[in-house]
């Protein structure tokens, strides 16, 4: 037992349950229902998942030792190895990584995505274990901790996610105490699940409001093993902003400045929500260098750019369920713990993504889709309507309930044969996650379309005019004009479409590698 482990585990009875990963292998059987801590690749268990996949590889047990796996969102690289070894029978509600996506799209893993605010509560309702043959609880939850308090409660690390709910509905719990990661004690605010009809309103009225519980309570009798973990989180470098993403950010900031001038937003805006990726980075960079001050953030995930945002002096406070930093970012965070720990809070995902709180605070939500159609429907998950990327995540939690719901995307993306082979503005989205009723603004590097108060045909005109790529604008305009002509004859002018043509851009991409049509009369 290392000295630092003994220091971190302040509940002495747990030290009698100290095990190695190998000593835990026999606890696991094919078909069990497992919960993991973690969110967006940080705070997930490492020792037990790695030990189990090593065991499968060593003994050729691929397909013979598989599990129903639940994680708050995406886990770390350990999940990729599980997917490569056919160890994931079912998975929810969100994932990231080529191996797990391949397993889903090959049909080896059954995946269901769900709004991240709803997934943990639905787990406590028994929705995901209703067909489990031996009870409705998870068999095991494996949770990473950075400390354990005197009463046995768990202090998470850089992610809270769905851990409180998983622990509450788990038969047995394994705690991995990560002694590589500094203790995060004091930075969390934990709400434990209370199911209807006893659930009370959330009292949060500002981004910095706290309930005051800094650790996850647990029944010590359920804890069957304590395992020391000495591996840190492995987060790949962030995608840097580029000219295109900075163009999108500039349009957005100009729009927000206009909203302030018109009196629709206060000078320090409302709490901001932003995803991850180069567009989100560019937006954060743009806000940090703008004239906005005393800003707050209410979001799912904080990444490296938020540390610079704090340092700019523009950001007062940020709250999320995960702080997903690179190695350099974590070092900077730990080196300045006294500064950052006073300015941010990590909460469970049912709180960070709560529709009630998002609506009350008037959050400004900004997310990136796969595609947006001319009437304002957005696809966030399924490429060409069928191939799963990562899952819905929390985008709809925010976009359905925010004061301003913004989708930002490049106007076009490259394909293998055409540098603008994929238009992100299409006649009809091949899959719909956010409806026309949810979005207020669509923005690309070409421009910004303000959709508020517009009927469908007016939305189509402004989206085509402001957001589409020049390579596609005439083609999209022609589709719209033909649809209006057709719908006029049919007296179906509310939201004009020609169903025989509406997916021709997608079909042409599948056949020819580009969405550029020779003609709308082209046959497929």
UniProtKB/Swiss-Prot annotation:
One GO MF term, please?
Answer: acetyl-CoA hydrolase activity
What are the record keywords, sorted? Cytoplasm, Hydrolase
Database matches in Pfam families: AcetylCoA_hyd_C (PF13336), AcetylCoA_hydro (PF02550)
Reactions catalysed, semicolon-separated, are: acetyl-CoA + H2O = acetate + CoA + H(+)
Identify which residues the record assigns to the active site. Answer: 300 (5-glutamyl coenzyme a thioester intermediate)
The residues listed in the UniProt record as binding CoA, with positions renumbered to this chain, are: 275-279, 390, 394
- Which domain of life, per UniProt? Eukaryota
Report the principal subcellular site. cytoplasm
Supply the EC number(s).
3.1.2.1
Query: Which BP terms from GO are recorded?
Result: acetate metabolic process; cellular response to alkaline pH
State any further remark. Has antigenic properties. Elicits a specific immune response in systemic candidiasis human patients undergoing malignant hematological disorders.
Role noted for this protein: Presumably involved in regulating the intracellular acetyl-CoA pool for fatty acid and cholesterol synthesis and fatty acid oxidation.
Family indicated by similarity: Belongs to the acetyl-CoA hydrolase/transferase family.
Protein name stated in the entry? Acetyl-CoA hydrolase
Q: Which organism is it from?
A: Candida albicans (strain SC5314 / ATCC MYA-2876)
Q: What is the lineage of its organism?
A: Eukaryota, Fungi, Dikarya, Ascomycota, Saccharomycotina
- From the UniProt record, report the name of the gene that encodes this protein: ACH1
